[in-house]
Amino acid sequence: GDIKLTKSIAFLANPGDRPTLYIRKGGFIIKPEVNNIPEINYFIVENVNVKEPIVSGGSGGSKTRLLNIGKHDAGTDITIDCFEIRNSDIVLPSTVLMMNDASEGMTTINHIRIDNCLVTGINDTKYVTKQFGFIHAINKGSNVWNDVSVTNSTFYEFYISPGVFGVLTADVPISANAKVSISNCTFYNWATSKSSY
């Protein structure tokens, strides 16, 4: 199930240890509400793998994601300074950072850093019928494209995802100074089953 976040969180391990954080049918959720806005400065995963466990009954499908920022109303704006994943193997069925619903309240993430990660999906065609972008922030209220850096990472076999960053709608705020940098990355069989985006 979901774990509601109200403070910053970091999953850290020593280099070379690489423990695994298992998530199934849920994940961490941020849900700002009037008079109850979480104070979250960072969400960090470093030297920790993130996976959905293999269990009888198949994958949890699109209900499994690392961080979900829920729909919220006007007057509940929230700013997260950084979302970082470094040195991690990620095996999830649908997405890592999910902001699927249009919101009147604004969620701003100042910096997104993905480095030295190996990212793949769970391609269980019976239970995984929807996949989203690795970062899926495509609608109104998703102000996350300010400073995105993806380096030294491999993205592979996520067949029905609409691209690594989803397909943005015209309502997504993007400033003139925004920058998205991708360097030294490999993409293989990502979104190969989508006929259009």
Residue map of PLM features:
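Extracellular beta-strand-rich solenoid/capping regions of secreted or surface-exposed proteins
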Residues: 2-12, 21-79
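Extended alpha-helical scaffolding regions
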Residues: 68-77, 96-106
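Right-handed parallel beta-helix
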Residues: 8, 40-52, 79-92, 107-127, ...
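Flexible gly/pro/ser-rich segments immediately N-terminal to CXXCH heme-c attachment motifs
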Residues: 102-105, 139-141, 168-174
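Extracellular beta-strand-rich, repetitive "passenger/adhesive" scaffolds
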Residues: 13-19, 48, 142, 174
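Structural detector of coil-to-beta-strand junctions
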Residues: 27-29, 56, 61-68, 96-98, ...
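Long hydrophobic alpha-helices with heptad-repeat/coiled-coil character
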Residues: 50, 60-64, 72, 163, ...
